[in-house]
Amino acid sequence: MAYYMTNGEFQAHMKDYYQRTGNRLQFPEMTEYLYNKGFLYDSIPAPDLTDDYDSMSDEEFEKVVDSLPLSLTLYDGAPLAPTVEEADLIPNARDVFVIRHPRYTRPNLHRHNYFEINYVSRGKGTFIF
């Protein structure tokens, strides 16, 4: 069964968990944590979309991205696979897919069976390759 939460809510929980515990979780681990705490929804939250993307400020665009729903499946507790499969992240029949990577995740050495491009739209980051 799929569960749901907005991108912004997921990120807020990642940040809160890190600030409270000093520990970073991987995406599947945080999904399990949120499920156990009762924070996930059974239905998809409606995104806050607008038609005027050409003249949006960065803050307005971030608000739209924060409102986008995530479809989450529960983590079974097994060791995280060393390969992130395309089917685990990219919807069927999509050649290009864009996500905002959540902050405060634990670095985890892995590989993909797809091509990934990282882009920092604001601030700075450290890319570990």
Residue ranges and their predicted role:
Residues 129:
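Short acidic-glycine-tyrosine-enriched beta hairpin
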Residues 1-126:
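Generic protein-terminus/edge-of-domain signal
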